[in-house]
Amino acid sequence: MDSPMEKFIQTYLTLLRDGDETVETSKLSESCRKEKLDMKQVNEWIALFDVDKDQKITFEEFCRGLGLKQNEMRIERNHIKTVQSGREQSLPEGVSIIASTMPKPKQVEVTQLFKDIYNEVKKDPDMNKVVKTFKSELERRYGRVWQVNAVTHSYWASFSHEPFQSIQFQYDNKIILAWRTPSN
């Protein structure tokens, strides 16, 4: 489930214009209202970005204001566009998503990565090796710092993560929890 911050970021990225990479504050407020976000919080966030009071928020201002990496937000924006266009791929066979804040294209990438590692190492019953390899590969592909857990029964979890960097899924008889925490 997306947090209010993730919904806000997704709303901004959806409205972002290609040419000049700006969003008008009025359009952002209107879209956030439609998404039923807390407008008091939205207005506080907008005030972080529009410091020059020109009623526009550039992509650079937005990322700087929230401490987000521009290159990662461009990737997230491309994922959003893929979903909106209907060109997204299906999840790998045998994978079911329990919860995720990742856009569907990234869910496909991450679950396929796990499935490949799991099936490669499956002959070795040491799940620790699978988890360590999966964590290392997530960090190589998506940056540091990832946390990975594998469980076989019920679980309860509460954790903080970077926007759009959390996934919980089941494959075979394993439940995998993975999320990225800030590295700074």
UniProtKB/Swiss-Prot annotation:
GO terms for biological process: microtubule-based process. It comes from the Eukaryota. SUPFAM superfamilies: DLC, EF-hand. Keywords: Calcium, Metal-binding. Residues 37-72 form the EF-hand domain. One of its GO terms (molecular function) is calcium ion binding. InterPro entries: DLC_sf, Dynein_light_chain_typ-1/2, EF-hand-dom_pair, EF_Hand_1_Ca_BS, EF_hand_dom. This is Antigen Sm21.7. It comes from Schistosoma mansoni. The gene is SM21.7.
